[in-house]
A protein has these predicted regions:
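N-terminal hydrophobic/helix-forming segments and targeting peptides
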Residues: 1-170
Length: 170
């Protein structure tokens, strides 16, 4: 059984490769199953979408004892296999969770630019979670550190992709 950490779209979780990370540092490949289309019919024939809890994640272990023998226990995490790549023309980057990666990159750039500067204040940088569902991570950070100034770095999905209304850049 898998419990979601953060927001997961079941439409992109099905039939994907993942890596299982054990608490003692071992890593194993995992594949997620997909619900066959004919099982996606709700009562009355209407289509229904699976939830992440409906999806099977398979690391190839025959049973719990075998998984335990390989150091796999409840609470170990699986993460999607994901590669960040350049497009053919080398002008754009393709990646999942781009908003998170972009935010961390901007924080890294900031820290690189101020690392040799004498600051008149304390600079604290961090990466937070669950901004889509109430800024929970940012709330914890601001409560714990009580900053005088707080900058959140994030971005929104692009609205200028092929087929959308409006012009490129809107």
């Amino acid at each position: 059984r898998v419990v979601e950490l953060g927001g997961w779209n079941p439409l992109v979780v099905s039939s994907q490769r993942f890596t299982l990370h054990t608490r003692d540092g071992r890593v194993y490949p995992v594949i997620s199953g997909s619900v066959p289309p004919h099982f996606l019919r709700a009562s009355g024939g209407a289509s229904s979408l699976p939830s992440v809890s409906d999806i099977v994640f398979d690391a190839g272990f025959a049973n719990q004892e075998e998984a335990n023998a390989y150091g796999v226990f409840p609470g170990d995490v699986i993460i999607p296999e994901s590669e960040t790549i350049l497009t053919a023309n080398q002008k754009n980057v393709i990646s999942k969770a781009w908003d998170n990666r972009y935010g961390v990159l901007m924080i890294r750039e900031l820290l690189e630019n101020v690392k040799n500067q004498e600051l008149n204040n304390t600079l604290i940088a961090g990466a937070n979670v669950q901004e889509e569902v109430g800024l929970r991570g940012a709330h914890v950070s601001t409560t714990k550190f009580d900053p005088e100034v707080f900058f959140a770095v994030d971005c929104s999905p692009a609205g200028d992709i092929y087929g959308n209304q409006g012009k490129v850049g809107d």
